[in-house]
């Protein structure tokens, strides 16, 4: 021991000391010197290496260390990072399924498209191009056209068949249109005859229709309906309107046309509307009192 010198231990005040050491993913050293000054990371690393400070290095994944640290605070938890094995494709692909059986064992004709009636002729041969097939009269659809015509024909007299019933309907429409452009007659003798002698029932329908039309025209001219069909009751009685009715609109001056004047001597009021003239005449007869202006004292 005599001449051996003991290793010199640096003074506590002169040597810097470490206050904390932590790492997460990469090392970081926080060093304070004797003057309580912070060192930058580069100087701190050099100081740590010079004093041979052992670093806590780990070759494991930092995330696994964090999970292990969190498991300590959660009782009964078992969080592990493990790669799940790849599932085989047989589990991902759908399995084979049996064909869905229909509700009906024997499907109807509308289910099987091969049994549908052909709306248009086939074009395989030239002879079948011009052939028209009536799908309304087919057996599958029950013959809708023939049944409707037979139902109408059953309600007609025995002497009229289905074809004559269709002719009567078209003739009635023609007669109704002719009534719209001609004046109503008292009897059906002056109506142009468009029916044959065999259609006796059609003649009775035409005669009843003409009587209803003539009765409607007679009631409308009398003005007994809800709305008057004639404007004779609203005709103006002013002198200008009397002249136009007597001599015609071309016989009087153009300035008097459409103008209604008062016939009271000394008045001379002129209005563009007959309703205004009638209101003025009520003032002459005393039915309507004259409104006084605010400035008039009398």
UniProtKB/Swiss-Prot annotation:
InterPro entries: Znf_C2H2_sf (IPR036236), Znf_C2H2_type (IPR013087). GO terms for molecular function: zinc ion binding. Residues 206-233 are annotated as: Disordered. It comes from the Eukaryota. Disruption phenotype: RNAi-mediated knockdown abolishes expression of sulfotransferase ssu-1 and thioredoxin trx-1 in the ASJ sensory neurons, in adults, embryos and larvae. One of its GO terms (biological process) is neuron differentiation. The keyword Ion transport does not apply. A zinc finger (C2H2-type) spans 260-284. The keyword Lipoprotein does not apply. Expressed in ASJ sensory neurons, pharyngeal cells, rectal cells, intestine, seam cells, and vulval cells. PROSITE patterns: ZINC_FINGER_C2H2_1 (PS00028), ZINC_FINGER_C2H2_2 (PS50157). Residues 206-218 have a biased composition (Low complexity). Keywords: Metal-binding, Transcription, Transcription regulation, Zinc, Zinc-finger. Belongs to the Sp1 C2H2-type zinc-finger protein family. Probable transcription factor which modulates gene expression, thereby acting as an ASJ sensory neuron terminal selector gene. This is Specificity protein transcription factor 1. The gene is sptf-1.
